[in-house]
Amino acid sequence: TIGDADVYTSLGPIGVLGQSLYDPGPLRTRIQSELTDGMLDEIAAQYARGRRLLIQTVDIETQIPYIWDVTQIAAKTGQKRQQIITDLLLASAAIPGLFPPVRVRVQRPDGIADELHVDGGLSAQIFFAPPGLDLAKFEIEYFGRPREQNLYLLRNGKLAGEDEAVQLNTLALTNRAISTLIKSQSRQNMDQIRSSLAEQGTQVYTAAIPDNFSSKPESMFDTAYMRELYRTGY
């Protein structure tokens, strides 16, 4: 099981004045060790079957969200695919302040540019497809007929508010405000997806951490907490 030491190292006081509080170097090493040619070939094979593995990030400089097709990258970018996907995975986990932004090289109409990308949660906690996408029309075009549509939304967090005493200091109040914002954004994202797809006959199922799950992590990647959470979900 992955713990804190497998994901980051603390930068100590110097991190306050730098890009982030933590260095995700261990996570980069772990991702690169897992993204073997064999795994990338398996991901690429799913692209040929019409399946998509999507990752969302945000360009922190332009404030524009990007959705990356990892399956296509695995299938069509040759020797650079491991590096590109590693960077995108790190960027998708780069919570500003905690982890540094990741520099991603992209092809623009006016040439190649380096962009700074961070966690896509800044734009949306959950995403599915561009607004207004007509799924039935899409399926008729690619499969010859509309099919039964089921969408499963999984949220690694609680959706309901939690009654909790908050210490009256800047850090505690800021953390509480961010937690409240994330929950509100998650509910709005899920409601928006559900309402937009209901008109097309799509059945939407949702799952989140139960309200009665009372355990609290001692750190960002508390192994004992993650095991208990897994048992609850399983």
Indicate where each model-derived feature is located.
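Patatin-like phospholipase
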Residues: T1-Y234
